[in-house]
From Swiss-Prot:
Residue span(s) of domain EGF-like: 44-92, 94-133, 309-348, 349-390, 392-428, 430-466, 468-503, 505-541, 543-579, 581-617
Signal peptide (residue range): 1-34
SMART domains the UniProt entry points to: EGF (SM00181), EGF_CA (SM00179)
Reported function: Activator of the NOTCH1 pathway. May mediate neuron-glia interaction during astrocytogenesis.
Glycosylated residues in this chain: 223, 564
UniProt-annotated location(s): Cell membrane
Region (Interaction with NOTCH1): 44-133
Residue ranges, Extracellular side: 35-640
GO molecular function: calcium ion binding; clathrin binding; Notch binding; transmembrane signaling receptor activity
Higher taxonomy: Eukaryota, Metazoa, Chordata, Craniata, Vertebrata
Ranges of residues in domain Follistatin-like: 546-568
Gene3D superfamilies membership: Laminin (2.10.25.10)
Expression sites (tissue/organ): Expressed in brain, spinal cord and adrenal gland.
Protein name in UniProt: Delta and Notch-like epidermal growth factor-related receptor
Length: 737
């Protein structure tokens, strides 16, 4: 049996109602054809000229906007008054008659215009009536029951266990048994293969507080029963068949409870319970694994096994008359290839926006009230207008700018480029250059045409008197740093300078800081004392001792007479510090091969054999070798003592002798002639030579570090000085001490 076409009650009234609306429709502003309104003067076309109101809506133009207060960007210049059942800015929205799923056992189609309700139910096999609510006698009466307590389902929090888990004895309801008939097709849905999705909350799809749900959707061919095979951990408690809206909202308000049949290992939904198209079920399962009552949301899409041949698509009811039904031999289902602008599994939805008729990125709104290709509305972006938003709005067409301003139109409105001297959104106000008090710091503003000038207060400058005069720019401080202070300046003088401009230098010498007749020399921030030679110090307060830094050695003394100290060396030393011992042997004072031994402030000569004297200048004649040998072998210090003693005795005797001789000679000289004088002279000469010899002997005895010696005196022949050829000293020989 083919699906029947059910006509909704009152469908035949639709043409009459449409005609009545056309005949009774009022003209603009309440005018009618019998009383035409006098023709208005020709002007620019209004916003209602494009007939933007759809579905019999009445367009009313808004008052012309004030140029000073233009309408908000994007707001149209008209409003639509929609008839009953129609809504939207352009009366483009019509309530979907199929949204409430009026067809209980069939598919709802809004394509027919012969129904006053705006929809047509295509009943499934076994059902009839305007809403497919009447079951044929072949439907088992035990398959449906009334909804006992329709209620809004509430999610179970994930952290909270249900108040009571029904035991299996109470959860399992005694159901009529079912046995498959010969050739009957059954599709099994295994419960353990259905995954629990935690984010699916029954009652609130965005909630995360539910214990989870099971969402299943699959297709089955027509005339096929569905067997829900349960496992050992879950048992089905309740099952409702709901509308599409109730399925989305997890609501049982418009649902009916379903009593499936009991089969081996599961529950069975008979094919008579599954209408052609979408079938939505909500069930509750007592799950012992999750220890909660899990919601099962089941969608079964039933399709006919084969396509119904027809002369045109209008008779192809499987695809709502707006598509081509196709099937494959390997599949038990069919699919619809929809015509242009039709969408949905059964091509049941008309989408006028599918071909994107709106231009300039406008939004297309599908009205869904008729299928003539014009049931859409374009919502234009700011700056565009027209049925398809194809025209750009010229906001400058009414010349809103005044006083010769230039109007610039943009997508969001217009802007006015004002000439000099005017301002405002439409350049309607004249500029007062001094109105904004541009002169700062108590400056006085004067209007100069469209400009202004400022007379600045003392200390300020600039076009708006905003700048302090920089008094320091001219560097008024001669020897200091300039600092601006308010409307003046101040000089911070460098050390050593004073005055208003730091032009005067301090004379530090006025206080006479230098002592001891020193000269004071004035400096910048200071002074310098030039001391006399014998003074030193910052103020020449210290006496400079010439000997303070002089080091005199070896018993020398420092002479501080003068500016520089001088060392006066002890005998035998030389040098600036008397640190050099004079080597008297450098002049080779020892004669006849004598060896010179340097001594402090002197020297000693070690004479060779046969020579004596300080410088080994006296030659000795020895009487015998024994005496010489004894002198040679005698210790030198003993010899020196003996010789010294002999010499002293000899000298005393010699002095006495000489004195006596000289006295005698003087007496004789006084009474004698010249020869006597010459003789006396020769005597003095002899006495002088002899005295030198004795002195040399004494020097050898009493010289520096000389060794003691004793001498025996013997006569020595002095032929030149002795008149009687008799030697005065015959022999000088050493004695052992």
């Amino acid at each position: 049996m083919q699906p029947r076409r059910a006509q909704a009650p009152g469908a035949q009234l639709l043409p009459a109602l449409a005609l009545l609306l056309l005949l009774l429709g009022a003209g603009p502003r309440g005018s009618s054809l019998a009383n035409p309104v006098p023709a208005a003067p020709l002007s620019a076309p209004g916003p209602c000229a494009a007939q933007p109101c759809r579905n019999g809506g009445v367009c009313t133009s808004r008052p012309e906007p004030d140029p000073q207060h233009p309408a908000p960007a994007g707001e149209p210049g008209y409003s639509c008054t929609c008839p009953a059942g129609i809504s939207g800015a352009n009366c483009q929205l019509v309530a979907d008659p199929c949204a409430s799923n009026p067809c209980h056992h069939g598919n709802c189609s809004s394509s027919s215009s012969s129904s006053s309700d705006g929809y047509l139910c295509i009943c499934n096999e076994g059902y009839e009536g305007p809403n497919c609510e009447q079951a044929l006698p072949s439907l088992p009466a035990t398959g449906w029951t009334e909804s006992m307590a329709p209620r809004q389902l509430q999610p179970v929090p994930a952290t909270q266990e249900p108040d009571k888990i029904l035991p299996r004895s109470q959860a399992t309801v005694t159901l009529p048994t079912w046995q498959p008939k010969t050739g009957q097709k059954v599709v099994e849905m295994k419960w353990d293969q259905v995954e629990v999705i935690p984010d699916i909350a029954c009652g609130n799809a965005s909630s995360n507080s539910s214990a989870g749900g099971r969402l299943v959707s699959f297709e089955v061919p027509q005339n096929t029963s569905v067997k829900i095979r349960q496992d050992a951990t879950a048992s089905l408690i309740l099952l409702w068949k709901v509308t599409a809206t109730g399925f989305q909202q997890c609501s049982l308000i418009d649902g009916r409870s379903v009593t499936p049949l009991q089969a081996s290992g599961g529950l069975v939904l008979l094919e008579e319970m599954l209408a052609l198209g979408n079938n939505h079920f909500i069930g509750f399962v007592n799950d012992s694994v999750t220890k909660s009552i899990v919601a099962l949301r089941l969608t079964l899409v039933v399709k006919v096994s084969t396509c119904v041949p027809g002369e045109s698509h209008a008779n192809d009811l499987e695809c709502s008359g707006k598509g081509k039904c196709t099937t494959k031999p390997s599949e038990a289902t069919f699919s619809c290839t929809c015509e242009e602008q039709y969408v949905g599994t059964f091509c049941e939805e008309y989408d006028a926006c599918q071909r994107k008729p709106c231009q300039n990125n406008a939004s297309c709104i599908d009205a869904n009230e008729k299928q003539d290709g014009s049931n859409f509305t374009c919502v234009c972006l700011p700056g565009y207008t027209g049925e398809l938003c194809q025209s750009k709005i010229d906001y400058c067409i009414l010349d809103p700018c005044r006083n010769g301003a230039t109007c610039i139109s943009s997508l969001s409105g217009f802007t006015c480029q004002c000439p000099e001297g005017y301002f405002g959104s439409a350049c309607e106000e004249k500029v007062d250059p001094c109105a904004s008090s541009p002169c700062q710091n108590n400056g006085t503003c004067y209007v100069d045409g469209v400009h202004f000038t400022c007379n600045c207060s003392p200390g300020f400058t600039g076009p708006t008197c905003a700048q302090l005069i920089d008094f320091c720019a001219l560097s008024p401080c001669a020897h200091g740093t300039c600092r601006s202070v308010g409307t003046s300046y101040k000089c911070l003088c460098d050390p050593g300078y004073h005055g208003l401009y730091c032009e005067e230098e301090y004379n530090e010498c006025l206080s006479a800081p230098c002592l001891n007749a020193a000269t004071c020399r004035d400096l910048v921030n200071g002074y310098e004392c030039v001391c006399l030679a014998e003074y030193k110090g910052t103020h020449c307060e210290l006496y400079k001792d010439p000997c303070a830094n002089v080091s005199c050695l070896n018993g020398a003394t420092c002479d501080s007479d003068g500016l520089n100290g001088t060392c006066i060396c002890a005998p035998g030393f030389t040098g600036e510090e008397c640190d050099i011992d004079i080597n008297e042997c450098d002049s080779n004072p020892c004669h006849h091969g004598g060896s010179c031994l340097d001594q402090p402030n002197g020297y000693n000569c070690h004479c060779p054999h046969g020579w004596v004297g300080a410088n080994c200048e006296i030659h000795l004649q020895w009487k015998s070798g024994h005496m010489a040998e004894s002198l040679t072998n005698m210790p030198r210090h003993s010899l020196y003592i003996i010789i010294g003693a002999l010499c002293v005795a000899f000298i005393l005797m010699l002095i006495i002798l000489i004195v006596g001789i000289c006295r005698i000679s003087r007496i004789e000289y006084q009474g004698s002639s010249r020869p006597a004088y010459e003789e006396f002279y020769n005597c003095r000469s002899i006495d002088s030579e002899f005295s030198n010899a004795i002195a040399s002997i004494r020097h050898a005895r009493f010289g520096k570090k000389s060794r003691p010696a004793m001498y025996d005196v013997s006569p020595i022949a002095y032929e030149d000085y002795s008149p009687d050829d008799k030697p005065l000293v015959t022999l000088i020989k050493t004695k052992d001490l």
